[in-house]
Amino acid sequence: MDIRPSEISKILKEQIRDFDQKAEVSEIGWVLSVGDGIARVYGLDNIQAGEMVSFSNGVHGMALNLEIDNVGVVIFGSDRDIREGDSVKRLGAIVDVPVGPALLGRVVDALGNPIDGKGPLKATERRRVDVKAPGIIPRQSVHEPMPTGLKAIDALIPIGRGQRELVIGDRQTGKTAILLDTFLNQKPFHEKGAGNEQDKVYCIYVAIGQKRSTVAQFVKVLEERGALEYSIIVAATASDPAPMQFIAPLAGCAMGEYFRDNGQHALIGYDDLSKQAVAYRQMSLLLRRPPGREAYPGDVFYLHSRLLERAAKLNAENGSGSLTALPVIETQANDVSAYIPTNVISITDGQIFLETNLFYQGIRPAVNVGLSVSRVGSAAQIKAMKQVAGSIKGELAQYREMAAFAQFGSDLDASTQRLLNRGARLTELLKQPQFSPLKTEEQVVVIFAGVNGYLDALAVSDVGRFEQGLLTLLRSDHPDLLQAIAHQKQITDDVKDKLIVVLNTYAKIFS
């Protein structure tokens, strides 16, 4: 074997040329104290607020308090294996999560890691969880309907795409059920060959501080009814640390913004923001920030407003996408004047108020029609629904007033009696079993029958049966009528005449 000096020198030259002198520099600090999910860290002098750090055991955290001599870090995970003196490394990044269609059908934690056992995510894009909401110029006023499939809501408290509608009530009044039915109601638009991309609404459910069994049940219902394929579940359950419960809504919102910014439509339900506020209060108190009313920190209003402002309807230059938010707030004994409920009511564009006593009377969904409002929804109602539901709100208000009065007197004149009868039947008509959302055109026909006196002769107990029979008849024998309402989005004179004929015949058969 002969050694050629020229070859050796060539190899050496190549190696010297490829030698990389770059050194990897990372700023490292040390843990001074740790406990209750908060670490005090010394030595990270150049860290920025909200920046991610990594502890020596691989757990991540976020710097929230920047003080003169130390940094307060909240820990995204267990603090059990973190000891005083451990090293902490700056990551130079803000909290971000995976986004995009690859997340549809999956259950992830607050940092976007899959927790459903279906393997790793195939998402390529990532987004920061806490970004600025769209300004005034890119927005457009709410004008497209966001159907929930619930008669009581779509007729009286309509929701539009890009709106923020609060769902508020005590525990066990059916708040999550409203979100669930709204998700299920988007199914027909996602079926093969149904409509165009503009009709599809992608759903995101953020569970904050819920029991794991509750979240599992929610996922199971979506899966059984074929609604999981267009939904994303973000879960920060009761057993997760407070920072995870605090960041989960922001993470879910970032996932929804992906659809909004790509000209698609998304709907996000935060269930519920009271628990996020409690988690934020816990973090703030442990970081020794000064407490305010009900011991919440002073910026808890800003926490919720910056989250809910990210729901928007964008104008055509920005792709016409939308993100609709349905935040949930749990009240204690119907106290709407507590700190968090008043905050969120003032931020949102209306509220759906659910009441325990209505729920126990069997009026479900237990919507209190008098206290519930939708500040922008009427602009998003189709003309057909406006035509039939215009009078129903007034009639129900009069009915409630009279019913309170009628408890005292027995001799009522004919007009009062008529009003009470009509009100009782309309209230019965607005009841709806769970998991059975109705298409808008079917709701229109049913309410048309109620407002035009077709129920007045029936016993209250027969109203439900009348409605079911009418819908079955229309679906089988008169689908053209339903299609006409769906396409024209209004009740033309021609459709009205045909409807009256159908209703007259059906009423005779029914009686």
From Swiss-Prot:
GO cellular component term, pick one: plasma membrane
Statement: the UniProt record of this protein carries the keyword Ribosomal protein: no
Pfam families the UniProt entry points to: ATP-synt_ab, ATP-synt_ab_C, ATP-synt_ab_N
Keywords: ATP synthesis, ATP-binding, Cell inner membrane, Cell membrane, CF(1), Hydrogen ion transport, Ion transport, Membrane, Nucleotide-binding, Translocase, Transport
This enzyme's EC code(s): 7.1.2.2
Domain of life (superkingdom): Bacteria
Molecular function as annotated in GO: ADP binding; ATP binding; proton-transporting ATP synthase activity, rotational mechanism
Site (Required for activity): S372
Recorded catalytic activity of this chain's protein: ATP + H2O + 4 H(+)(in) = ADP + phosphate + 5 H(+)(out)
Keyword Ligase recorded: no
Subunit note: F-type ATPases have 2 components, CF(1) - the catalytic core - and CF(0) - the membrane proton channel. CF(1) has five subunits: alpha(3), beta(3), gamma(1), delta(1), epsilon(1). CF(0) has three main subunits: a(1), b(2) and c(9-12). The alpha and beta chains form an alternating ring which encloses part of the gamma chain. CF(1) is attached to CF(0) by a central stalk formed by the gamma and epsilon chains, while a peripheral stalk is formed by the delta and b chains.
PANTHER family in alphabetical order: ATP SYNTHASE SUBUNIT ALPHA, MITOCHONDRIAL
Family in the record: Belongs to the ATPase alpha/beta chains family.
Descriptive protein name: ATP synthase subunit alpha
Source species of the chain: Bartonella quintana (strain Toulouse) (Rochalimaea quintana)
